[in-house]
Amino acid sequence: MICLQLVSNALQFLSVVAERSNYRKIFENPEILANICENVVIPNLDFRQSDEELFEDSPEEYIRRDIEGSDIDTRRRAACDLVKTLSQNFEAKIFGIFGRYLEILLTKYKENPAVNWRSKDTAIYLVTSFASRGGTQKHGITQVSELVPLPQFCAQQIVPELERPNSNTYL
């Protein structure tokens, strides 16, 4: 538990540093951004075994935490916040990097959906985090990035899952 809190705090620290104008030059390097995306963001967006156990044991609690935002101190929420910060400050650079990882995640899912469903879950988190530009607790997301075709992503990736006859098999 302490380790997870440390990861969450480290991700929050990176978000704060990325927002500061005097440190932005560090994050403008494409190699650094790619390393942060690959080695920090993606692993912490993954739906982990502990997440699955909480969902299986108490789905209402899992959903409540997610909707209410009481998962604020989790590594997954901190990774989402880091994605939002990076995409708001380095949108064009980050779009290409995350686009490649999104393609990798969705390809992995398509290879074996029953086994690789976590890849699609991570992809969805990545897209929603990247697309978010502003919002409120009451209304949710109120502004989105123009670079992210959310209706198209939803039509191609979300709706088919919801329309699947056995949609509770995975995802």
What would you call each of these model-derived segments?
Residues 1, 162-171:
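Short, intrinsically disordered, charge-balanced linker/junction segments flanking boundaries
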Residues 2-160:
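Alpha-helical repeat/alpha-solenoid scaffolds of the HEAT/ARM/MIF4G superfamily
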